[in-house]
Amino acid sequence: MSVHIEAKQGEIAESILLPGDPLRAKYIAETFLEDVTCYNNVRGMLGFTGTYKGKRVSVQGTGMGVPSISIYVNELIQSYGVKNLIRVGTCGAIQKDVKVRDVIIAMTACTDSNMNRLTFPGFDFAPAANFDLLKKAYDAGTEKGLHVRVGNVLTADVFYRESMDMVKKLADYGVLAVEMETTALYTLAAKYGVNALSVLTVSDHIFTGEETTSEERQTTFNEMIEIALDAAIQQ
């Protein structure tokens, strides 16, 4: 048992999916997993373990933003020995050729968060995904005929941004999309020597205003979850 997770030892699998929304964690468990048990309800941040294609997998809500996901990733690794962590969530596209419903796999993540500068004063640490997980997820996506993009994303500390100037500059440098957690996940995975990946669906385009319908979001979300689960059980 840790501060924010009430699971007993052995109740959490070595491979885990990390949606921000705890209700998405519940949806994933109920829709994709078999023999499901709920191991956590502290602060309503639900966690479940079950099997997918006969292999144990867990799913844990993390909340939104760098501070929140950092809490859960630290505890999952340090207290429960989790080895493979895959964030599943949504993002906003900032490239013209990235469309809503595309799947983005984050190879790395730049950020406006000060998280890493507190650890590396005067340096810009560049956290990266685990290549084996990335390749497995990419292959799973392309086999399903999905439009999968691999590249850099922005992990933002601010959701309601007053100025988009920096986001536009990052787009000029090839950043694909904006989300709020990947930098923290990849940095902590590097610190503890475990494997991490972010698989994201494009829910909207920040510059064009294009958005997905709720039905489109759910369909694309399901495809993303299958990609993540297929990668997780092969690791």
Curated annotation (Swiss-Prot):
GO terms for molecular function: purine-nucleoside phosphorylase activity. A purine D-ribonucleoside binds at residues 4, 162, 179-181, 203-204. Its EC number is 2.4.2.1. The record marks 217 as: Important for catalytic activity. InterPro entries: DeoD-type, Nucleoside_phosphorylase_CS, Nucleoside_phosphorylase_d, Nucleoside_phosphorylase_sf. One of its GO terms (cellular component) is cytosol. The keyword Transferase applies. It catalyses: a purine D-ribonucleoside + phosphate = a purine nucleobase + alpha-D-ribose 1-phosphate; a purine 2'-deoxy-D-ribonucleoside + phosphate = a purine nucleobase + 2-deoxy-alpha-D-ribose 1-phosphate. It comes from the Bacteria. Phosphate binds at residues 20, 24, 43, 87-90. One of its GO terms (biological process) is purine nucleoside catabolic process. The keyword Transferase applies. Keywords: Glycosyltransferase, Transferase. The active site is at residue 204. Catalyzes the reversible phosphorolytic breakdown of the N-glycosidic bond in the beta-(deoxy)ribonucleoside molecules, with the formation of the corresponding free purine bases and pentose-1-phosphate. PANTHER family: FI09636P-RELATED (PTHR43691:SF11), URIDINE PHOSPHORYLASE (PTHR43691). Belongs to the PNP/UDP phosphorylase family. Homohexamer; trimer of homodimers. This is Purine nucleoside phosphorylase DeoD-type. It comes from Bacillus cereus (strain ZK / E33L). The gene is deoD.
